[in-house]
Amino acid sequence: MLDGMLIALARMEPEERLEQVARFVPRMDNWAVCDTFCTSLKFCKKHPALVWEFIQPYLTSARVYDVRFAVVMMLAHFITEDYVEQVLALLDGVRHEDYYVGMAVAWAVSVCYVKFPALTLEYLRNSSLSDFTYNRALQKIIESLRVSREDKSLMRSMKRR
């Protein structure tokens, strides 16, 4: 965890930071380190195209925390008007069956819904998410304090049985 914080906070060029990130990601072995690391990488805001390109290969890795890293990076830095459609398309393509990957995808979908409800609702109606991930995403939306009572009722009606 300390190594991750140093990578996030030390002064360095973005390319050097991404080299350090690439060395650190394989050492992640739990969701807390992964999520804290991803959310602490504030340089992403200044270099979105570079970071976006960097995280793409991690989405198809066989390693749990490689995939979670990419998903949490998208959720922390790319649920924006410029990237949300691409984020949803990529989330729909995540096929790793691990619990921690599914939960990260569900979390990301719920944040998409909070920020872009109409777009995410359309996505949910047509997504190919696993039943587990889809229902977890709905549950996270229902639990959100930033979603209306009416939208929560709609989410309850959309659950897959």
Question: How should each PLM-predicted stretch be described?
Answer:
Residues 1-161:
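Alpha-helical scaffold domains
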